[in-house]
Amino acid sequence: MASALRQEGLTQEDYIEIQRRLGRDPNRAELGMFGVMWSEHCCYRNSRPLLRGFPTDGPRILVGPGENAGVVDLGEGHRLAFKIESHNHPSAVEPFQGAATGVGGILRDIFTMGARPIALLNALRFGPLDEPATQGLVEGVVAGISHYGNCVGVPTVGGEVAFDPAYRGNPLVNAMALGLMETDDIVKSGASGVGNPVVYVGSTTGRDGMGGASFASAELSADSLDDRPAVQVGDPFLEKGLIEACLEAFQSGDVVAAQDMGAAGLTCSCSEMAAKGNVGVELDLDRVPAREQGMTAYEFLLSESQERMLFVVQAGREEALMQRFRRWGLQAAVVGQVLEEPVVRVLQHGSVAAEVPARALAEDTPINQHTLISEPPEDIQEHWRWSETDLPSVSRDHDWGADLLALLDDPTIASKRWVYRQYDQQVLANTVVPAGGADAAVVRLRPQQGDASLRGANRGVAATVDCPNRWVALDPERGAMAAVAEAARNLSCVGAVPVAVTDNLNFPSPETPKGYWQLAMACRGLSEGCRVLGTPVTGGNVSLYNETRADDGSLQPIHPTPVVGMVGLVEDLGRVGGLAWRQAGDAVVLLGVSSDERQDDRVGLAGSSYQGVIHGLLTGRPPRVDLDLEQRVQALVRQAWEQGLLASAHDSSDGGLAVALAECSIASGLGVDGALPGDGVAPERRLFAEGGARIVVSVRAECMDAWTSLLADEAHAAVPVTILGAVADHGRFRLSLGSQPVLDQAVQTLTERFDQALPRRLGTA
């Protein structure tokens, strides 16, 4: 029995509770059902109490947490569905298929709501890129994402990629998707109508993906390579047909409820639909389209074969609906019915193979109780004692240009063109700002069907994914709050008003005091950031146990990584901007926190890229997040875009102000003549310190009078404004500290280092 419980990821206490709920011992199929549905991946048994603290209400929220995806009202008939999810463990053992099926799964969450997918983003984390093992993972994951997205015909428009030893052996692959509603009514997943048929559509069921949900809820080890059968195999061309057939079916009015079959397959779909509708579902496995012979009830119920959906259909309309799917070359079969008794009853070969109360699987699931320590762990407190004065002193003739080049060569900061050039960013012809051109992607709001498709298509949605994982490692609360702030800042830099959030909480085990403290503090910071910035959480994903067991038995946890996916509204696509300088003579201005004060705790080198790349350190307490100033700085930038005063906007984040300015020059090929304030402040702080509420803008030379008038507005009086210099056409990147020149590099030199960092390491330069 002990080995059977381990196989299902259950404890002895879980087994006793299962016996109590059933009033008997479970059979193998039932034990498997409980194993996947009581896993962290499906029921959030460690994180659910923390998630309840997230703000989830707002004037634009149509659907919040609990459905396949969140939905927000963007006005003028535009309703946007969006969601982020992880496929971390599968991608670690089978990078191509793990990443590809992660894309397929998040797309199904979107179109299951009745929305047509319009864009994809991803947030990726890997170990050091100089290591061959990491290079193989990167190549496989990027190829998998590219393959599925390109084939299914949905553009991948943005994302982020970071490299750190903490992710060695346990990469993070988070996929986000956006979709525009095409149905009048949002499709929900709660079953209703006793006697209504349950219809299976899509691909056939095989043995691939067996136990994927339980696999995703355990740490990785050297033996995990043997778990390749737990990784699903995707077919993007079949999914393309499934998208079209589902959207047609939803328009017909014949579908009562819909649920995609992702983690835990048929078990999850049946139990969630039944529990949400307070009804039951009877499932006959003999009717399920199978691709393999002799499959047991256990295998049918736990298979995670891809591109499958489960519908509850209006009685009498099932044949017409199935004909619709068959025209698209898809399987379709009536496999059960809605019951009044609130159970999931599974039949096979004329007998009951399993019968479990639906709520026991999908609603009334266990919660693991953890005690939150009252003080930060001792190692964190030790980190917080670090001071910038502990850094090695530098000589007066120190080569700051070499430091800047080293930062631009860091794979986390460097150009990700090697990644996004493999993605089709322009399919559907709605991508306005693609990856690499700005701090957020922008996609035109142009539905293919419905009244909204007939209106002018001059509105857009902006999207971004962000997480400063080095900050979160040192202070989870500040780091998670900074993730929300940076996401909103990135949207504001393209002129978008932040609307709502979907989150992906990637963490190590919560079963240690430090692990649970990290998770709890990050949730607190994320919640506060969303509350103050007015961006409610519409749903997301929790991925725990992201850690690798070494050969000596020790566990190597990842950095806690709460990825924030945020969407924003662009009212006028003619006022969207990027990060590149536009013309010589434009003023270069820093809005927000400057680096010219030693004691300002809103900016610093703790946890910075400079600290890591130049000194090999990760220590200190990250800067305090000033959410009030964030709001003010972002509002000023958005209004300046609206008035047509700006030529560019770019947030200062990884690498600090010097790197932000360099990225603007690299993107444009134009030079800059700039001077940073702060006499008496260490040069490294002025050049490379990081902090929130900092945006570099270039103001059109012909708009300086209007810019001055805007700054005089009382609403913007509290925003610090620092004139740094001007855009130049001499092709040099020149910065001085006061009157002392410290950087004078050819923009071409910066560009070559920035562009070649990934290709050189991957052998494709």
Curated annotation (Swiss-Prot):
Keywords: ATP-binding, Cytoplasm, Ligase, Magnesium, Metal-binding, Nucleotide-binding, Purine biosynthesis. It catalyses: N(2)-formyl-N(1)-(5-phospho-beta-D-ribosyl)glycinamide + L-glutamine + ATP + H2O = 2-formamido-N(1)-(5-O-phospho-beta-D-ribosyl)acetamidine + L-glutamate + ADP + phosphate + H(+). Mg(2+) 2 binds at D109, D260. ATP binds at Y44, K83, D503, G540. Pathway: Purine metabolism; IMP biosynthesis via de novo pathway; 5-amino-1-(5-phospho-D-ribosyl)imidazole from N(2)-formyl-N(1)-(5-phospho-D-ribosyl)glycinamide: step 1/2. One of its GO terms (molecular function) is magnesium ion binding. Substrate binds at S86, H87, N88, H89, R108, Q232, E304, S305, Q306, S543. It comes from the Bacteria. The active site is at H41, H87 (proton acceptor). It holds the Pfam family AIRS_C. The keyword Cytoplasm applies. Mg(2+) 1 binds at E85, N541. Its main location: cytoplasm. The keyword Membrane does not apply. GO terms for biological process: 'de novo' IMP biosynthetic process. Its EC number is 6.3.5.3. GO terms for cellular component: cytoplasm. It is found in: Cytoplasm. NCBIfam families: FGAM_synth_II, PRK01213.1. Monomer. Part of the FGAM synthase complex composed of 1 PurL, 1 PurQ and 2 PurS subunits. Belongs to the FGAMS family. Part of the phosphoribosylformylglycinamidine synthase complex involved in the purines biosynthetic pathway. Catalyzes the ATP-dependent conversion of formylglycinamide ribonucleotide (FGAR) and glutamine to yield formylglycinamidine ribonucleotide (FGAM) and glutamate. The FGAM synthase complex is composed of three subunits. PurQ produces an ammonia molecule by converting glutamine to glutamate. PurL transfers the ammonia molecule to FGAR to form FGAM in an ATP-dependent manner. This is Phosphoribosylformylglycinamidine synthase subunit PurL. It comes from Synechococcus sp. (strain WH7803). The gene is purL.
